[in-house]
Structure formats: structure tokens, C-alpha cells
């Protein structure tokens, strides 16, 4: 059953006003879905505080993925699957955002070219400036949507999604046709991704588990950044807020694993 609007949504609007400002909220008052998605990752994002940036969270992810809290998924993937590569690889990264992972990979001699595809030109420009500063010449940047990109004319040794696949519609078609079309026969697909409920419509059991976890955290660590509010519980996310904030957010995420 869909939750259209919840207390969580009202609280989030208040928090976003304090963290990202009125201009960010006003950017959502448009019928242009692409502009909404782009604004979700604008410069004001730096004024937010997100749980996935917590070092201990990252260490746990590393441990769950690689077995070692100090080894991230990129290093693990390179060592386990690419160490025997016969020639430098050509990579396509879809929804690359700020390209922080691609900039790290580009420093590895295994990669001949990494094509970063994203709809946010500002983020790509920032990444290009960082690449120039680091002396990296094997990164290229393409500001297009997946509908505009010509998959048929390209061939890649590897295609990667890093927290971006859940922003694409019709995951089955994207992976089964478009990605398959541009991936070489022995090519690899790397996915580091949120694979939960579409539009974050978590079940009652999941919400209960989240609230149980919240109660384990001491109050000082539950204060919402740049506000005087403390997180006491999670009410569930409303479908409408997710859509208005970013129409691409978790749009087909429930189908990632089945695909």
C-alpha cells in the first residue's frame, strides 16, 4: 500500500529549508522532471548531512562486500576480477554524478578510458577540473540522458553503476538491451547499488526495524544537522515527496535484483 504523504515528509521539508535553503525548495516547483533531478545534486548538497557518509557505515559496507572494513568495492573488484586483464579497459559509467569513484579508477593503469555519462553538466565540469588538476587524461565526460546516448555505436569492456541504477526506469530493458548492446561479449557489469523498495515504500516490518535501530543511538547523535530537532522515529517516506524532490529517485529499484 502506497504512503502518499507522511509526517516524515513535513519534517524533511523543514530540515531541507535549513540545510539547503529556500532556493533549493523553490527549484522543485517545476514540471520539468530533468531539472528536478539535476537540482537534487546541486551545490547545496554540500550543506547536508547524510548517514551514508558516516565512516563506520562505510567500513561496514566494505566488510559486507569485501570481507575487510578497510578495502572498498573498487579495490576488491580490481584485484579479484581485473588483475589478469590483457589490455587496458574501456569503461562506461552511467549516472556518474561528481565522478568521485571514476577519478579514483582513472589513476589505475588498467583503464584506457572511462566515459562518464550524466545529465548534470555542472557536476561533470567539476570532475573535469579535478581530472585536469590530477593530470588524468583517460576520463571523458558526456552530458546526456540514457535516451540520448547512442549505445549501439559503442563497445565497452565494463559498464558500471554506482548508486545510480535506481534512478533509471525500466531496469530490465536497460540492462537486458541497452547495456547488453554496448558491452563486449566478455565484458563485465559492476553494480554498487540501493536495491530496496521502489520510491522507498518500506514495509511496516522494515519501518519497525529502522525505529528499533534509531532507539539504539544516543540522543546527542540524533540531532538533525543545522536544526534543533532530534530524530525520534521514522514515519515512512511519502510517495509524493520522493516524486516531487526527484522523479528519478528509486523509480524502479525493486526490480534491480530480479533483472
Q: What are the language-model segments listed below?
A:
Residues 190-226:
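Conserved class I S-adenosyl-L-methionine
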Residues 218-259:
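Substrate-binding/catalytic lobe of Class I Rossmann-like enzymes that use SAM or dcSAM, i.e.
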Residues 60, 65-88:
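Conserved alpha-helix/loop element of class I SAM-dependent methyltransferases that forms part
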Residues 150-158:
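A short acidic, Gly/Pro-enriched loop at the edge of an enzyme's catalytic core
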Residues 172-188:
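A short glycine-rich, Lys/Arg-flanked "PGG" loop and its adjoining helix->strand segment in the class I
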Residues 1-59, 67-72:
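N-terminal, positively charged/glycine-rich alpha-helical extensions of SAM-dependent methyltransferases
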Residues 157-170:
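A short SAM/SAH-binding and catalytic strip from SAM-dependent methyltransferases
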Residues 93, 98-148:
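Class I SAM-dependent methyltransferase SAM/SAH-binding core
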